[in-house]
């Protein structure tokens, strides 16, 4: 297929070529993969400035998206892409093939550095979804940081560089420019641009930006950062977002209240114990969706209200495929049981079948199938069975359908259990307040509704 680059894509390609170390903050749907591959093609095969390229991406994107995109476009026919995914033998075979472009899953980086760090073969590295490197204490960050002196070009790609806070971008730029712009240490960056927010006498729980610090941060990184928004460049399909209220049956409502009050709930086949605020948030979300994991590891059915509501939405779609985003494994099992026509979208074959219209109900987990996947050809209806706290995963999953190439208006439905933590999660997503402190505040609010203020103060 012939690639006719839009003006914004041409500008992005040139930016990568002209900036050895840079960040592309490209909104979902702008074509960051073909942009980057086009820049690689120019750098490696026209200018001879790059010999080998490593693409670090979410597992499924590393396995499927980059090779598929290279094969799709005529001008990229000379690019050979090796996928270093699988067991150690398969990964080594791909790396030692000498392919111009090698793709790896991000969790493979420690293994890669341990085995190939001394004779590091890649002079250019692409961080696809660089926000996954926001934790400077992670093994992947430390491993990649150790080989930075051997890398001459680094490109970071993401649509959500700071999903929770501008604290998230420090580690990404530490890898991009070696600490030149935002400093070599997180503590120095934090002290310069942030001040304590929520704290106790001995511990700081959250940080907030100092006055105009965000503008100062943007000014620091501006010379190596290109940011583009989809609304400025794409004719995207209209998106309708709706909340579908779900009423819990009386027994489930009583169970929800008891769990909120006591943080304990006895079920017929096991005990549910929420040990802290984060644990209680998780348990309340499980219960709102219909089942609970017990201390014994079993999933106990509490209600089927959301299953029934989903059935009505599927029926209303009148045969049009519906994508359902789930969060808990217990929900996946229940969905597969309740809807025999459903199929989990977990591998390349199932995603091809979805795009071909062969799957009437596709079940997707946003954590494993959000970034970089093109699923817009298979349908335009999406239902959130359980809405997660993660704004990044939420936006990325929605963009699988609401993206360039979608031929129909997109409908996104949220099954929200009335008067439960579901309502607070969706509100947090709407206001983009999805920090840990928002989660704690939501749990406090749930406890306060049970008239046990002393319990709420424990957090």
Region annotations inferred by a language model:
Residues 110-115, 164-166, 330-334, 351-355, ...:
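SF2 helicase motor core recognition
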Residues 61-86, 176-179:
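Conserved helix-turn-beta segment of the N-terminal RecA-like "Helicase ATP-binding" lobe
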Residues 1, 18, 31, 35-41, ...:
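Conserved Helicase C-terminal RecA-like lobe
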Residues 78, 97, 124, 141-232, ...:
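Conserved P-loop NTPase motor "coupling/switch" region that bridges the ATPase
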Residues 88-122:
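Conserved helix/coil segment N-terminal to the catalytic DExD/H
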Residues 1-25:
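Conserved pre-motif I regulatory segment
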Residues 35, 50-72, 163-168, 328-329:
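Conserved Walker A/P-loop ATP-binding site and its immediately adjacent core
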């Amino acid at each position: 297929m012939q690639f006719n680059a839009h003006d914004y894509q041409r500008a992005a390609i040139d930016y990568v070529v002209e900036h050895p170390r840079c960040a592309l903050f490209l909104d979902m749907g702008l074509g960051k993969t073909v942009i980057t591959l086009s820049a690689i093609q120019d750098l490696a095969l026209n200018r001879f400035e790059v010999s080998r390229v490593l693409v670090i991406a979410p597992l499924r994107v590393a396995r499927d998206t980059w090779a598929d995109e290279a094969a799709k476009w005529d001008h990229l026919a000379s690019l050979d892409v090796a996928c270093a995914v699988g067991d150690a033998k398969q990964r080594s075979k791909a790396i030692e093939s000498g392919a111009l472009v090698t793709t790896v899953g991000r969790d493979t980086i420690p293994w890669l550095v341990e085995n190939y760090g001394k004779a590091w073969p890649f002079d250019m590295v692409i961080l696809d979804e660089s926000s996954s490197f926001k934790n400077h204490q992670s093994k992947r960050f430390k491993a990649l940081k150790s080989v930075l002196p051997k890398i001459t070009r680094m490109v970071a790609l993401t649509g959500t560089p700071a999903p929770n806070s501008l604290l998230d971008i420090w580690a990404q730029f530490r890898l991009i420019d070696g600490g030149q712009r935002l400093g070599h240490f997180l503590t120095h960056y934090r002290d310069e641009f942030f001040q304590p927010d929520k704290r106790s006498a001995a511990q700081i729980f959250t940080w907030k930006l100092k006055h105009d610090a965000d503008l100062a941060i943007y000014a620091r990184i501006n010379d190596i950062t290109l940011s583009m928004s989809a609304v400025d460049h794409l004719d995207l399909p209209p998106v309708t977002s709706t909340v579908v209220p779900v009423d819990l049956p009386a027994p489930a409502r009583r169970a929800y209240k008891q769990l909120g009050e006591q943080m304990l709930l006895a079920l017929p086949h096991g005990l549910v114990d929420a040990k802290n605020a984060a644990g209680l948030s998780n348990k309340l979300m499980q219960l709102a969706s219909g089942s609970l994991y017990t201390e014994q590891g079993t999933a106990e059915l509490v209600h089927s209200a959301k299953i029934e509501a989903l059935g009505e939405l599927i029926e209303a779609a009148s045969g049009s495929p519906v994508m359902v985003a789930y969060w808990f494994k217990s929900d996946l099992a229940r969905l597969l049981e309740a809807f025999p026509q459903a199929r989990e979208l977990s591998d390349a074959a199932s995603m091809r079948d979805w795009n071909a219209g062969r799957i009437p109900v596709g079940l997707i987990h946003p954590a494993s199938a959000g970034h970089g996947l093109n699923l817009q050809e298979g349908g335009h209806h999406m239902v959130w069975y359980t809405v997660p706290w993660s704004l990044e995963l939420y936006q990325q999953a929605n963009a699988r359908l609401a993206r360039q190439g979608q031929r129909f208006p997109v409908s996104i439905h949220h099954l929200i259990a009335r008067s439960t933590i579901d309502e607070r999660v969706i509100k947090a997503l709407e206001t983009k307040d999805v920090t840990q402190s928002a989660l704690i505040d939501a749990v406090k609010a749930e406890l306060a509704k049970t008239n046990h203020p002393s319990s709420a103060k424990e957090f």
